[in-house]
Amino acid sequence: MQIEFYGATSGVTGSCHILRANGETILLDCGLIQGRREEAEKNRRPFPFAPDEVSAVVLSHGHIDHSGRLPLLVKQGYRGPIYTQNATADLCDILLQDSAFLHEKDAQYENKWRKRKKKPLIEPLYTVDDARAALEKVVGLRYREKREILPGIEIRYQDAGHILGSCNVEIWLSENGKTRKIVFSGDLGQYDTPILNDPSVIEEADHVIVESTYGNRRHRDREATIDEIGEIISDAAHHKGNLLIPAFSIGRTQEILYYLGKYYDQWELDRWHVFLDSPLAIRASKIYWEYPHLYDEEATKLRQRVNEMPHLQNLRLTPSPQESMAINQIRSGAIIISASGMMTGGRIVHHLKHNVSRRGAHIMIVGYQAYGTLGRKLVDRMPTVKIHGKEYPVKASIHTVGGLSAHADIDDLMRWMGNFKNSPQVHVVHGEPEAKQAFSERLATDLRLDASVPGPGDTLEL
């Protein structure tokens, strides 16, 4: 029995690990590598394992950095099932097809200049048909349902509190009369956040593979964060500019809408035009509405009293390209919620092009920004940014609001790890190097756990 560490070992994106036992091979996540172009190009490299030799895929949640290479895996020969939680299965239906559509468009765009330069044309990483082929293999499971997926291999999903359908995965591997329990954290959510439940309590494991996105940081107090959002909205109104909110289509968008509705009167939002300009986020929000049994207690009560749910009276959904382009004619008084969250593509890039050089405009960044992304350059206060090949001076006001992260901070991570009553070996992944190192040191000093930081391709015999 062994674990092989591959994706999200040298950074945050591209989650991907292998478990081997009883002659079977299990793939934990198959995520897209995101960031700078040279990082994204790694997605085209061959997998460090043979896709046709994988017996089953176990997916923690739908975010593309965890699921985004599943169509490529199937395209290259994988034939087995893809297990995940039911809500994640529904979210993947829209996420993977959207990702494939973007890959097709990116290839078309690049091939235009390649053709002019008489360079070889490229193929998209995968197509919508490839995504649909992968989706046919998805098997949805309920939380807390223990399932034998292969001889001697059982799994059980627990709520990770990160996004709808996100999971911690308990995995039991049995071989030659020995059983080892592996717990894969997936992405952990914060405690005491709206809509979703807290991360589940798991008390026993032999090995824990745990994320560390914010393994060296504490998030700002949530109440202070809500106050800050109100101040940003007020400031943007005073400057008579637009307010752009780049947001992940799954999770962050729904939380932003929840707060805008809850504080509609307090933040005087009746003076704004509010646009949800993301077809993916619009469809995802409808899926959120279909899973009220996964909400936390407060959201469940509000959902049962549907007329009392926080809502935005002036919210406008803009699914069509024509509606989206029309927003760019508005120079002030618009709150524009759009994707992608890291500003690596999608409609938000077009809105940035029209607003980033306006002094009265405000850009509120409410999620993690990976190294090399356009969003990270704004967070790092770069004086200019390149959009569609052209440099734009950054004159808009940039606000980084950290308290809304869907990821656990260091205190949340330590709280979750503190639930283990035995002393599992811990393997820290899914973080920048300094975050992984800081978290592993805290685990060793505060919880006296044997914590390591595996590198790409490292193998651990169980």
Describe every region a protein language model picked out.
Residues 168, 189-277, 362-367, 384-450:
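Cap/insert and terminal regions of metallo-dependent hydrolase folds
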Residues 28-30, 54-63, 70, 82-85, ...:
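Active-site neighborhood of phospho(di)ester-bond hydrolases with catalytic His/Asp-centered motifs
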Residues 10, 63-65, 163-164, 248-255, ...:
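Gly/Ser/Thr-rich loops at beta-strand to alpha-helix junctions
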Residues 30-34, 55, 179-185, 191, ...:
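Acidic/glycine-enriched edge-of-secondary-structure segments
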Residues 1-52, 133-197, 322-329, 335, ...:
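Core dinuclear metal-dependent hydrolase active-site scaffold
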Residues 99-163, 292-331:
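Metallo-beta-lactamase
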Residues 232-371, 386:
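Hard-cation-handling environments
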Residues 9-11, 21-80, 84-136, 188-197, ...:
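Pre-active-site segment of Zn-dependent metallo-hydrolases
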